[in-house]
């Protein structure tokens, strides 16, 4: 049979993790196969039609900075864009976009189909070929065998997926799609820790049955933001508004009186749901003192009447769903197009992974996305890109790569997962990062694109745009530094008139920009400078105003990095290290951290224990030096 069976990398699953993994691998020049159960659902948004948000947009921008597809697909499909936390500092500002679900999926598929080195094939994966603790390939549903150096599993909610509506349940990967049962059984045979998690989705509403006049309109921002460093507002489709309404006492009464029919509260569902995206049942139960909860009415697209009521995810029986929806203001006559549901699925303890997202026990087998216990398109895409990159690096015989916590939110995400593990779906927040001021969404390209180019992820067009931006920032900062304004001159008076800022002596424009009351656009207007790229202007202003704080964080990072990156030997026996408590010895032996920094983030491992480890490593190193000299 003249059909390719040997590849460098095989990716299982065509969701947000799988598409980024396959694209990253193929961009690096290795022969990549993407196996999906249905080509029509590549890049499908299974839950809400939105990308970005607090902490999440930072991941999207980092994916973009490394050449990924998510941000550009969002710019081409986004029907509403907003910057959250706009009145706060740049560290926590976050771009969020409502996407047209159909356009987003179409854009992702177009990118995949036009990516060199990438083969797409519609088949379920039912088995892994493993020999001597090394993955060698996969077996599909119809018995085809494909071989590769690396395999990336991005199975989402499909592994052993079980859909719940009320007390009834059935197998499914998501509504309308079959689960991966054979692969789930195969995975449970491997020496990996497995658990069950749960997520859910609300009923979809026909917009023609909704009264928007009694809701609060939520328009997008003007000027319209963009998500990709390569994007622009001209890419965006027509922009629309979202709407806000609220639950009420009647809604809560309906839910509370039917909790005995909820699979979550009747013991039918065993998996743990996402803490930060709870079902409406959870909200009513956990926050019984609250009189109402916000419901965001989000359009599913420009060519459909379907609406996504964000905030009422539920797995209650359909008759209860209908009653609770119709109790909400503006939805008294609502028609439900699709019922809400909960889904349980298998995930694997991410503490069994290396930083590369390769499993510790099966060489060449990588995990990305919900299989690692995360929730969210952005978290999945970030892991997919990293896993695909490292799968390709392994196939090329090169060292693996993962950004540190002080380099990227991707680094924070991976370090949290493989060090701490998770017992509930993990969601990214800016509060999880220690160095938020350095890890802003606006500078993701300055942090990561050079590394992406080195890895082979960045094409010539993106590299040229990045270099132009980087050089433009340097030129403008130098211009501001070397341009001086004196009191009692035309420029000096213009600054006083514009900002009410008296000039007591000569200042450089860079010194003036550092003042909190002076903004870059106003400074250029007052001093007659030329307009420059808005991305360059943004960087110049942020870097200047926050220079002191940024320098302080950089100094702190430099101090910590020496011990943070100290490697712990694979064969280290923690039970032989005197001074460590039995509890800490047990935690270190179970987790097997790769570095001192990772060890320090294990719950219960004290600073004193880290000091003992450092002393042990120094003694061990000195002892080996003596052995070698003898």
From Swiss-Prot:
Identification of the protein by name: tRNA uridine 5-carboxymethylaminomethyl modification enzyme MnmG
Protein family membership: Belongs to the MnmG family.
Positions contributing to FAD binding: 13-18
Gene Ontology CC entries for this record: cytosol
Subcellular locations according to the entry: Cytoplasm
Keywords: Cytoplasm, FAD, Flavoprotein, NAD, tRNA processing
Taxonomic lineage: Bacteria, Pseudomonadati, Pseudomonadota, Gammaproteobacteria, Pseudomonadales
Quaternary context: Homodimer. Heterotetramer of two MnmE and two MnmG subunits.
Keyword Chloroplast on entry: no
NCBIfam families for the chain: mnmG_gidA
Pfam families: GIDA, GIDA_C_1st, SAM_GIDA_C
Residues at which NAD(+) binds: 273-287
CC cofactor: FAD
Domain of life: Bacteria
Example GO BP: tRNA wobble uridine modification
Source organism: Pseudomonas putida
């Amino acid at each position: 049979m003249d059909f390719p069976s040997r590849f460098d990398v095989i990716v299982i699953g065509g969701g947000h993790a799988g598409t980024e993994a396959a694209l990253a691998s193929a961009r690096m020049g290795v022969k990549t196969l993407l196996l999906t159960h249905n080509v029509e659902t590549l890049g499908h948004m299974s839950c809400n039609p939105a990308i970005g948000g607090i902490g999440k947009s930072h991941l999207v921008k980092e994916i973009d900075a490394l050449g990924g597809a998510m941000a550009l697909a969002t710019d081409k499909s986004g029907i509403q864009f907003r910057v959250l936390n706009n009145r706060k500092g740049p560290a926590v500002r976050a771009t969020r976009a409502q996407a047209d679900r159909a356009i987003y999926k179409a854009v992702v598929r177009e990118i995949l189909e036009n990516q060199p080195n990438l083969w797409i094939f519609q088949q379920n994966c039912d088995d892994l070929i493993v020999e001597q603790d090394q993955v060698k390939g996969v077996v599909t549903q119809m018995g085809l065998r494909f071989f590769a150096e690396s395999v990336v599993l991005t199975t989402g909610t499909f592994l052993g997926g079980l859909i719940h509506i009320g007390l009834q349940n059935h197998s499914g990967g998501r509504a309308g799609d079959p689960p991966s049962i054979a692969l789930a059984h195969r995975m449970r045979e491997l020496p990996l820790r497995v658990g069950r998690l749960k997520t859910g989705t609300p009923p979809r509403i026909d917009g023609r049955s909704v009264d928007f006049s009694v809701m609060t309109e939520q328009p997008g921002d003007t000027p319209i933001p963009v998500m990709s460093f390569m994007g622009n507002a001209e890419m965006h489709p027509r922009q629309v508004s979202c709407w806000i309404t609220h639950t009420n006492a009647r809604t809560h009464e309906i839910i509370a009186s039917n909790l005995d029919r909820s699979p979550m509260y009747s013991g039918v569902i065993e998996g743990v749901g996402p803490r930060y995206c709870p079902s409406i049942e959870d909200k009513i139960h956990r926050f019984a003192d609250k009189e109402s909860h916000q419901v965001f009415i989000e359009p599913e697209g420009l060519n459909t009447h379907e609406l996504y009521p964000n905030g009422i995810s539920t797995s209650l029986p359909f008759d209860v769903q209908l009653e609770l929806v119709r109790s909400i203001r503006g939805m008294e006559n609502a028609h439900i197009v699709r019922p809400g549901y909960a889904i349980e699925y298998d995930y694997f303890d991410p503490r069994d992974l290396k930083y590369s997202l390769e499993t510790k026990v099966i060489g060449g087998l990588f995990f990305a996305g919900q299989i690692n216990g995360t929730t969210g398109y952005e978290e999945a895409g970030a892991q997919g890109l990293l896993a695909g990159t490292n799968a390709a690096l392994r196939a090329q015989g090169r060292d693996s790569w993962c950004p540190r916590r002080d380099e990227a939110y991707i680094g924070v995400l991976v370090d949290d997962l493989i060090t701490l593990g998770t017992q509930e779906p993990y969601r990214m927040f800016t509060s999880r990062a220690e160095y938020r001021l350095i890890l802003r969404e606006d500078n993701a390209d300055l942090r990561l694109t050079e590394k992406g180019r080195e890895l082979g992820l960045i094409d010539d067009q993106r590299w040229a745009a990045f270099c132009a931006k980087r050089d433009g920032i340097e030129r403008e900062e130098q211009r501001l530094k070397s341009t001086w304004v004196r009191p009692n001159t035309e420029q000096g008076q213009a600054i006083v008139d514009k900002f009410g800022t008296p000039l007591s002596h000569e200042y450089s424009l860079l010194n003036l920009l550092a003042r909190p009351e002076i903004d870059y656009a106003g400074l250029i207007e007052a001093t007659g400078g030329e307009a420059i790229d808005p991305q360059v202007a943004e960087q110049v202003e942020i870097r200047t105003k926050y220079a002191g704080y940024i320098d302080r964080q950089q100094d702190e990072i430099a101090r910590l990095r020496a011990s943070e990156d100290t490697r712990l030997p694979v064969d280290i026996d923690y039970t032989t290290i005197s001074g460590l408590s039995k509890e800490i010895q047990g935690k270190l032996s179970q987790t097997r951290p790769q570095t001192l920094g990772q060890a320090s983030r294990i719950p219960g491992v004290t600073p004193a224990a880290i000091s003992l480890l450092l002393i042990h490593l120094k003694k061990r190193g000195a002892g080996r030096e003596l052995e070698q000299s003898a």
